[in-house]
Swiss-Prot record:
The gene is drdI. Keywords: Carbohydrate metabolism, Isomerase. Its EC number is 5.3.1.-. It is an enzyme of class 5 (isomerase). This is 5-deoxyribose 1-phosphate isomerase. It catalyses: 5-deoxy-alpha-D-ribose 1-phosphate = 5-deoxy-D-ribulose 1-phosphate.
Amino acid sequence: MEEQLIPIQWKDDALVLLDQTLLPNEVVYESFNTAEGVWDAIQVMKVRGAPAIGVSAAYGVYLGVKEFVESTEAEFIDEVKRVCAYLATSRPTAVNLFWALERMESVATDHTHLSITQLKDRLLEEAKEIHREDEEINRQIGEHALTLFHDGMGVLTHCNAGALATTKYGTATAPMYLAKEKGWDLKIYSDETRPRLQGSTLTALELQRAGIDVTVITDNMAAMVMSQGKIDAVIVGCDRVAANGDVANKIGTLGVSILAKYYNIPFYVAAPTPTIDLKTPTGKEIPIEERDASEVINRFGQYSAPKESKVYNPAFDVTPHENVIAIITEKGIVKAPFTENLKNLFQ
């Protein structure tokens, strides 16, 4: 087993991120000392995955105000709000980003009696707490998910909802790591996940380094491996779950869910509760980020289509709740009716 890749670290009063745009060929860690640097790291996907984005943004708030020139507490709180609003523009789909920023803003607005120095300390502690919570949430998701798995089964996953998308264990990959700890032998199939190839460059990399049996397939091979009986379950992560159980996740997830339903294979979604957005009624209201055409036709510095080609590049799609057998959270496994049962998680 190779040394574990650590996507997010806090060292020497700076945010240290593993640059995931360079994987699997280079392992490079980069330090960030400003909110602007964190914004850029999120936007260009040096850090990615809904939980990891949320944690990074939380640290970004602190970095954005730590050098704030001493003034009034009211002006400092306004600056916290400004930095939160700025970081919220980095990527629109992952609800963890907004959840984390709301927590950071609340630290300032709920503690107006503190001095500016005390507020700065409290902001950093809140960011660290969000970081710590994520690791525990992931393990709990893995423990619940493992009750749906058994030794020797074949599991398909899409994109990267692994340790690289969170702080440890991942969400969709958490049961894979825990199964490894139990001595189970799962057979993991990882869709490469066009156009940014997170399944092959990230999921396959981290599972292979952990000694977990993983096979990379192209996205359009999923139907074939299902038809061959190699897949017993599908598990994916998510960037947002609507109140009715519709799920926004990496582009291509919808197609995988349709195939799983056709072949009568259970389709599971691993979702930390901060990813569940009860304020969004259905998947139709989830904003879908559209990214640059170059990701599709010039991925490796050479055009794979005419340069002038029209390109449609949504980063996410929405899987209807009808295709989802269960949503696995740190609080337990949620099944239909999702509208009622998701709401019950927060009561």
